[in-house]
From Swiss-Prot:
The gene is psbB. Binds multiple chlorophylls. PSII binds additional chlorophylls, carotenoids and specific lipids. Belongs to the PsbB/PsbC family. PsbB subfamily. This is Photosystem II CP47 reaction center protein. It comes from Coffea arabica. It is found in: Plastid, Chloroplast thylakoid membrane. GO terms for biological process: photosynthetic electron transport in photosystem II.
């Protein structure tokens, strides 16, 4: 046929059997990739430390999606929450991966069958004997079936009526686990961070889809609408399908980047806005203040801060710190976290508590500045020592650790104080192992960043695809050079005045 690469899909334009075949093959490829990727991730995943080396630090991409839907156990005997299991059941991580691969193989065979047996009676119009598809009817069928699946997911899987529920956690990502969720039918259901909205919205959207599907199965479109929207043209289906996909991709890019109940931080890592707003830092200070109010010492109050909470308050876990073309997991960047050293509190020689100004997200380097409780600069690490007035040496800054591995340890040596002041710019201070993975010390993004970038990019690409194919189907006659009035234009004597359609002669 000699088609150029960008025209090859025309071979299935008027061939319903093989159109179905290539779509089944596409499903086989998607399911096969998902299953294979899951097995690869399971082969390299280390479940030993869910607090300091969780899945998102290791660059896992499909494991978080399985986990949020209720899969927590492995046939390897481990649980995602850190415990051990003796009987993981059929729906373990490996079981789900295997099911996808088996399904992929079946789809592969079905695609071959439909490619060979393409000329089926079901695709023939009994009036003309030519291949054709009743697209409005097919639309109704698909809408009905997707509505049933959507309703079933919300009413059974999420609620735990027949299924495990979904991953639910507290606002600080500390107590996450899989549990049933009751639908939220009030205004709270519209809060993107309320898990109950997932159940209620799937039930509502599924019900709407079922009703809309039945409507489109029982009511034929008006002729004017059918022709106006080119409902008989398969490219209309392509255009509207691309629209649905790019819209969904934009939505999930938003829910992933800004955070929601569907993207828990325990599975995908924290969002950049939690660093920007000092979200975890405020909670840590609140807990310490509450401890001090109960007559605990500073050391006791800081020692009760969960290591998991402290780890979230570290800039290396900010997905916006990773460069666009830095491949690899977060662990390949700053290393594998070993332990929390504790919270450093700096003081000058007059006993004032000093706070290190934290590095904003989009800075690679940032001056080390220490301010007091009123925001007044009291110390810094100067660029030019000759002109310095607030250097650590001049101000006599000391540092003492509370909580963590260095609890109770203090330093007055200026070089050591400056070292910890630089590290305090990056949030809570952790011991990081950079030797095991030969980590290069350059921050990487988390799967949250990759997912957002990928879906936003493809959404933009698919948006143009929707415009392209929509224009092709709406203006097909124009692009083909076929004008409905063309025959009248060239017919001798059709108009009293040449080229003026308002002077058309009446047929005798």
């Amino acid at each position: 046929m000699g088609l150029p690469w960008y025209r090859v899909h025309t071979v299935v334009l008027n061939d319903p059997g093989r159109l179905l075949s290539v779509h089944i093959m596409h499903t086989a490829l998607v399911a096969g990739w998902a299953g294979s990727m899951a097995l690869y991730e399971l082969a390299v995943f280390d479940p030993s430390d869910p607090v300091l080396d969780p899945m998102w630090r290791q660059g896992m991409f499909v494991i978080p999606f399985m986990t949020r839907l209720g899969i927590t156990n492995s046939w390897g005997g481990w649980s995602i929450t850190g415990g051990t299991v003796t009987n993981a059941g059929i729906w373990s991580y490996e079981g789900v991966a295997g099911a996808h691969i088996v399904f992929s193989g079946l789809c592969f065979l079905a695609a071959i069958w439909h490619w060979v047996y393409w000329d089926l009676e079901i695709f023939c119009d009994e009036r003309t004997g030519k291949p054709s598809l009743d697209l409005p009817k097919i639309f109704g069928i698909h809408l009905f079936l997707s509505g049933v699946a959507c309703f079933g997911f919300g009413a059974f899987h999420v609620t735990g009526l027949y299924g495990p529920g979904i991953w639910v956690s507290d606002p600080y990502g500390l107590t996450g686990k899989v549990q049933p969720v009751n639908p939220a039918w009030g205004v709270e259901g519209f809060d993107p961070f309320v898990p109950g909205g997932i159940a209620s919205h799937h039930i509502a959207a599924g019900t709407l889809g079922i009703l809309a599907g039945l409507f489109h199965l029982s009511v034929r479109p008006p002729q004017r609408l059918y022709k106006g929207l080119r409902m008989g043209n398969i490219e209309t289906v392509l255009s509207s399908s691309i629209a649905a996909v790019f819209f969904a991709a934009f939505v999930v890019a938003g829910t992933m980047w800004y955070g929601s109940a569907t993207t828990p931080i325990e599975l995908f890592g924290p969002t950049r806005y939690q660093w920007d707003q000092g979200y975890f830092q405020q909670e840590i200070y609140r807990r310490v203040s509450a401890g001090l109010a109960e007559n605990q010492s500073l050391s006791e109050a800081w020692s009760k801060i969960p290591e998991k909470l402290a780890f979230y308050d570290y800039i290396g876990n900010n997905p916006a710190k990773g460069g666009l073309f830095r491949a690899g997991s977060m662990d390949n960047g700053d290393g594998i976290a070993i332990g929390w050293l504790g919270h450093p509190i700096f003081r000058d020689k007059e006993g004032r508590e000093l706070f290190v100004r934290r590095m904003p997200t989009f800075f690679e380097t940032f001056p080390v500045v220490l301010v007091d409780g009123d925001g007044i600069v009291r110390a810094d690490v100067p660029f030019r020592r000759a002109e310095s007035k607030y250097s650590v040496e001049q101000v006599g800054v000391t540092v003492e650790f509370y909580g963590g591995e260095l609890n109770g340890v203090s330093y007055s040596d200026p070089a050591t104080v400056k070292k910890y002041a630089r590290r305090a710019q990056l949030g809570e201070i952790f011991e990081l192992d950079r030797a095991t993975l030969k980590s290069d010390g350059v921050f990487r993004s988390s799967p949250r960043g990759w997912f957002t970038f990928g879906h936003a990019s493809f959404a933009l690409l698919f948006f143009f695809g929707h415009i392209w194919h929509g224009a092709r189907t709406l203006f097909r006659d124009v692009f083909a050079g076929i004008d409905p009035d063309l025959d009248a234009q060239v017919e001798f004597g059709a108009f009293q005045k040449i080229g003026d359609p308002t002077t058309r002669r009446q047929a005798v």
